[in-house]
């Protein structure tokens, strides 16, 4: 997994920079392919936005196997066999982790971007604008919120789970619950983080969807559960009721990925039973068991 390269001398997890940061060009049907995982919160963001904006015919997608091995993400029945092959085809000297999401240019045979924070913004501004997830009137506020979510929650749960020092771990956990407390107050008075559904809601949802089943126990963010926050829990369930959210949420793949793949935290690879959470009406089985690769 090469995670040791991202642990500082004081035991702090410092996420690697994204290697490929070119902006997505105009949409061209058949040219770009998204490699994503239902298990990964960063990748699920892009899957949600792709579905919300109706970009299925413009951005092809390949779903990788949720169980990552020593070679990285495997592409079931695919060519290449492993995502790492695309990274080395683009940069033969690449030495970092092989991450999803990434966008492959099928014409030029290279990875255009694995810059997960920017991919959704590019789709929202250059590929589709209905619904408008990044409205100009809210962009400064959305940017501020996204930054707060990243440092206080989205990445902070990883800083807690991957930390190698007690104080570093406790500092990360404190940030997580300070952020959740702030969001609980905000969402007690609002349906969304702003007066309309935005990119920020997508970024928050993918962390909330994993919180009780993974981050609470596996990453030791165990002060409170999502279900202990009435407003946040109701908000998460409202978003889950939207097809783009529940069709891209696979709780089984999420749990198996973290508990089986991250053996430095869970060497037994035992996947816990539960928790039993009522997310509301389940989507049709066909939506939850999509083929690994779709055109």
Predicted regions and their residues:
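C-terminal alpha-helical interaction module
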Residues: 1-295
């Amino acid at each position: 997994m090469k995670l040791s390269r991202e642990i500082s001398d004081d035991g702090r997890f410092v996420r690697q920079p994204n290697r490929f940061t070119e902006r997505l060009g105009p949409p061209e049907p058949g040219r770009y392919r998204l490699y994503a995982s239902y298990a990964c919160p960063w990748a699920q963001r892009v899957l949600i936005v792709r579905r919300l904006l109706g970009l299925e015919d413009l951005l092809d997608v390949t779903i990788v196997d949720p169980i990552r091995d020593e070679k990285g993400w495997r592409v079931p029945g695919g060519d290449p066999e492993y995502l790492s092959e695309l990274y080395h085809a683009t940069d033969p000297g690449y030495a970092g982790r092989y991450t999803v999401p990434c966008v492959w240019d099928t014409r030029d045979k290279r990875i255009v971007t694995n810059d997960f924070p920017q991919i959704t913004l590019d789709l929202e501004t250059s590929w589709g604008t209905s619904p408008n997830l990044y409205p100009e009137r809210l962009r400064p506020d959305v940017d501020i919120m996204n930054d707060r979510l990243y440092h206080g929650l989205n990445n902070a749960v990883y800083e807690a789970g991957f930390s190698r020092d007690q104080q570093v771990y406790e500092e990360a956990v404190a940030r997580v619950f300070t952020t959740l407390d702030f969001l609980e107050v905000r969402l007690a008075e609002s349906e969304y983080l702003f007066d309309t559904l935005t990119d920020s809601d997508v970024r928050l949802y993918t962390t909330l969807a994993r919180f009780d089943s993974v981050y609470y126990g596996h990453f030791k963010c165990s002060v409170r559960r999502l279900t202990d926050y009435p407003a946040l829990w109701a908000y998460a369930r409202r978003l889950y009721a939207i097809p783009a959210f529940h069709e891209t949420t696979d709780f089984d793949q999420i749990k198996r990925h973290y508990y089986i793949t991250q053996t430095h935290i869970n060497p037994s690879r035992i996947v816990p039973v539960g928790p039993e959470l009522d997310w509301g009406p389940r989507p049709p089985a066909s939506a939850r068991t999509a083929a690994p690769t779709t055109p």
